[in-house]
């Protein structure tokens, strides 16, 4: 009787594992196949799109990438995205890391109020406040023009980076402070005894210990900033304003669809995807470690 029960439990466990693996493989296929198709489409000649869409490319037609990079200004758009993303990440880390450290490691008056305010920010969808942000910047720009002759708050990559960093603060501080709170206080106390300052303790002890979570935050926010479209399109509305990659890609797709230049369109899409894929491959191990350690400590 016991052997029968063990066999049935093993059979159920094996069936469960098979189901899990089947679902995972199915999800992987649904992700890999479209990405692979886009990469293949980016090196096809235009005539190949009118045949079998699943056929392998007849050759490597790199002119699509050249046309997208030079003719469609994707190189210029990529540089703008690199500047905005790097600046937004730098501003975000400069503000969020000390803020999360103070909120998680020190007890002071108003700490709970600040935590509540940052928590409330998690429930605000950024897409819903794009118009108020635009109106606020526009009115401030009008005031600057009236008093100083010119404004700089709209169609400005630096201002766009500041807005990106500000909208990402609640999530970043919430996640980092939760991780910082799980770190032991023994190292800090030993550092204080040795005469280390609060800043030195934060930068030399706490931040290295929290490296996995910091890398996770950087990757998540990089993906968010790199692929962001609504805010960029709204705040960079002038025809002469610099464009980021998502906005430039949409313009490219509309232009190439009307001209039936599908190869150039997919080549532009590949240029947008490549940096995120390369970054993920480079930090995959640290990202997994950060998520695992955070889950275990939580």
Please state what every model-predicted region is:
Residues 2-298:
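A hydrophobic, multi-pass inner-membrane permease signature
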């Amino acid at each position: 009787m016991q052997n029968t029960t063990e066999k049935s439990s093993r059979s159920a466990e094996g069936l469960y594992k098979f189901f899990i693996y089947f679902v995972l493989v199915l999800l992987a296929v649904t992700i890999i196949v479209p990405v692979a198709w886009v990469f293949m489409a980016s090196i096809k000649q235009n005539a190949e799109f009118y045949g079998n869409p699943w056929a392998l490319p007849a050759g490597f037609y790199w002119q699509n990438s050249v046309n997208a990079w030079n003719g469609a200004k994707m190189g210029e758009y990529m540089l703008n995205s690199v500047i905005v993303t790097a600046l937004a990440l730098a501003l975000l880390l400069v503000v969020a890391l000390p803020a999360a450290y103070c909120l998680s490691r020190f007890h002071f008056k108003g700490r709970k109020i600040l935590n509540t305010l940052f928590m409330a920010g998690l429930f605000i969808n950024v897409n819903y406040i794009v118009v108020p942000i635009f109106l606020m910047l526009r009115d401030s720009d009008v005031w600057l023009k009236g008093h100083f002759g010119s404004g700089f708050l709209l169609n400005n990559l630096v201002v766009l980076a500041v807005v990106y960093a500000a909208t990402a603060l609640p999530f970043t501080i919430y996640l980092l402070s939760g991780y910082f709170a799980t770190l032991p206080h023994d190292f800090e106390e030993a550092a204080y005894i040795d005469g280390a300052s609060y800043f030195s303790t934060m930068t030399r002890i706490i931040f290295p210990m929290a490296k996995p979570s910091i890398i996770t935050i950087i990757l998540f926010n990089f993906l968010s900033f790199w692929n962001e479209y609504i805010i960029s399109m709204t705040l960079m509305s002038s025809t002469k304003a610099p464009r980021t990659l998502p906005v430039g890609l949409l313009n490219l797709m509309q232009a190439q669809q009307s001209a039936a230049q599908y190869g150039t369109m997919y080549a532009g899409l590949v240029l947008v995807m490549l940096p995120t894929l390369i970054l993920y491959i480079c930090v995959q191990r640290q990202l997994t470690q950060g998520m695992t350690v955070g889950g275990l400590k939580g």
